[in-house]
Every structure is written in C-alpha cells, then in structure tokens.
Amino acid sequence: QQYSITDTRDQVVDFSEPYYTTRQALVLYPDSEFAGATSVDGLKDAVLGAAIGTTSLDFIEDVIKPSSEPSVYDENVDVAAAMNAGQIDGLVLDLPAAYYMTAVEVEGSIIAGQFEAEAAAPDDYGMLFAEGNSLVSCVNAALAELKDEGKLQELEDTWLTQGGEIPIISD
C-alpha cells in the first residue's frame, strides 16, 4: 500500500521523507463524453468517484469542483466496481494506481489525462510509521543516500515513470 503524505495523516502517524512524487489522473471509458477534456472546466458535469480519505477525493473537491458531489467509496476497488456498473462517469486517483485500474480493475477503460502538477499540492509518497518510531531517522538517512547516489531516480525511471504519453488536463 502506498501512502501520500498529508497534514491530516501526519497528525496521527510519522512519515519518512518523500521518496516519490506523482500526479492525479482521470480514468474514463474511451467513448465517454468527457474523454476529450483538456481542462478541469470540461469535467464540471462529470460524476466522479474516489475513495474516502484520499488525496484523489480532495483533488476532486478542491480542484475539479464538479457540479455534483463526488461519489465516495471505501476503497479504490469499490470505485472501480461503481465505474464498471455505470454509476459514475470516471474516477480520479494517482497515476500509478490509474495504470493498475485500467489494466486490471476497469476493463476497457483508459487514462484520459493526468492533471497539471501545479493544480494542487504534489502527491508525495512516504513510508508510514507509528508516531514516534525511532526508525524514521534511519530510513530518512537511507533515502537521502539513495537519492544522492541517483538510485531513487533510477528506480523511478525503471519502474514508475510512464506518464509522458498521457495527455495533460490543465486547471
């Protein structure tokens, strides 16, 4: 499980320094009336779904601001089920999860776009620890070394960076 670093979460757990930054993405069916959207304005009438307590739900509410309330589900798999059942037009989640959704959970769907990084605070991933855990400083030191040696970038380039061909949806 990946965890985005948020102020709310940081109040109850400790995070390592970020090791990966990603964008939010939009998953739709290719024949959706919203598939050609190039800006968030083109999504105002879309019924969008996201999992509760996620940065994706925050993104829908704070950046896209659709005319109808987003549909909220317990888990991403529930959002996928709603899309498969035709209950929502699309779902918003981070780009790596969007690749998984389109490949496994929502057959025939596409990543219609990724949102500009400037549209909201970056979605930084960090390792999660119980509050006060003494391992945080050790993990941060290891992450700093991996970053300084270029290993984090190498891992990202090999395993996590695929968004170049996905269209950008502007704010």
Regions found by a protein language model. Name each.
Residues 55-71, 110-112, 141-171:
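Ligand-binding clefts/hinges and TM-proximal coupling segments of bilobed small-molecule sensing domains
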Residues 2-11, 61-62, 89-121:
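A ligand-binding cleft/hinge motif common to bilobed small-molecule-binding domains
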Residues 21-28, 103-141, 162-171:
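Periplasmic-binding protein-like
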Residues 35, 71-85:
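Short helix-initiation/N-cap motifs at beta->coil->alpha
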Residues 39-54:
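Short loop->beta-strand "edge-of-pocket" segments that line small-molecule binding or catalytic clefts
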Residues 31-39, 71, 132-137:
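Short helix-loop capping/hinge motifs at secondary-structure junctions, enriched
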Residues 43, 83-84, 127, 139:
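Hydrophobic residues within well-ordered alpha-helices
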Residues 1-42, 116-117:
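Acidic, polar ligand-binding/catalytic clefts
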